[in-house]
Amino acid sequence: MSASNVSLLHETCRQVAAGGCAGLVEICLMHPLDVVKTRFQVQRSVTDPQSYKSLRDSFQVIFRTEGLFGFYKGIIPPILAETPKRAVKFSTFELYKKFLGYMSLSPGLTFPIAGLGSGLTEAVVVNPFEVVKVGLQVNRNMFTEQPSTFAYARQIIKKEGWGFQGLNKGFTATLGRHGIFNMTYFGFYYNVKDNIPSSKDPTLEFLRKFGIGFVSGTVGSVFNIPFDVAKSRIQGPQPVPGEIKYRGCFKTMETVYREEGILALYKGLLPKVMRLGPGGGVMLLVYEYTYAWLQENW
């Protein structure tokens, strides 16, 4: 193996390790908000006696009826997926960015286009895990009463198969969710970071990067949430058991808009922003600092 190939492999391993650490830290800190977000997104009517009245009400009800572990339902699939997911997210972003560099595009275009490519690639890896995660998150039984992650995955495969009606349902919505988020997230972060002077003070530099990452995650959440709502409706339980109401991504958006109004496409926005705002800052900081440490020590 040539020296250049060894160097490329070494660089990829650093990206995988740094991305995995970033994903693990972010998911462990922010998963409770993801559970709340998903519950809001699958609600169809405020008149439903099981509907949450507010963000505070959702936390109180989940804690009272399902216990502390209720906030960590469905956490195993994202943990299992985080290392390959974040490895794909960051390594393919770097790969697409390098490829686009040969096309003489401006940085203003290179970063969002590379982000879009990384998001679409990431969606392919993560979608089966998302199907299992959403199914577990919307289960309102006590944590100890619900099926295990692997038992639930086997149940989906047995009943619905591996395809777009089974373990890969909601695939187009996942493509839209991740593609648009990464396009906005990376595009905003790197373009803004390059235009705001860095600081020699480590604390100020940390806050500068975290602040830009926070805003990047927030903006990405606002732009991609209609796809996230569609994904939750398709991958979650259908209104009538045995009857599939939500199928394609855009058809689902149309149905939600027609029956519930435009604001229904933004259900769960507050917990999503509360998660992916600070989560976006945390993830990029953990990635950058871990990657820098690995460059110095490995």
UniProtKB/Swiss-Prot annotation:
One of its GO terms (biological process) is lipid transport. The keyword Metal-binding does not apply. It is found in: Mitochondrion inner membrane. Solcar repeats lie at residues 10-99, 106-195, 204-293. Keywords: Antiport, Lipid transport, Membrane, Mitochondrion, Mitochondrion inner membrane, Repeat, Transmembrane, Transmembrane helix, Transport. Disulfide bonds: none annotated. It comes from the Eukaryota. It catalyses: 2-oxoadipate(in) + 2-oxoglutarate(out) = 2-oxoadipate(out) + 2-oxoglutarate(in); hexanedioate(in) + 2-oxoglutarate(out) = hexanedioate(out) + 2-oxoglutarate(in); L-2-aminoadipate(in) + 2-oxoglutarate(out) = L-2-aminoadipate(out) + 2-oxoglutarate(in); glutarate(in) + 2-oxoglutarate(out) = glutarate(out) + 2-oxoglutarate(in). Its main location: mitochondrion. It is a multi-pass membrane protein. The keyword Hydrolase does not apply. InterPro entries: Mito_2-oxodicarb_carrier, Mitochondrial_sb/sol_carrier, Mt_carrier_dom_sf. Coiled coil: none annotated. One of its GO terms (molecular function) is antiporter activity. Widely expressed. The chain crosses the membrane at residues 16-36, 69-88, 112-132, 166-186, 204-224, 276-296. Belongs to the mitochondrial carrier (TC 2.A.29) family. This is Mitochondrial 2-oxodicarboxylate carrier.
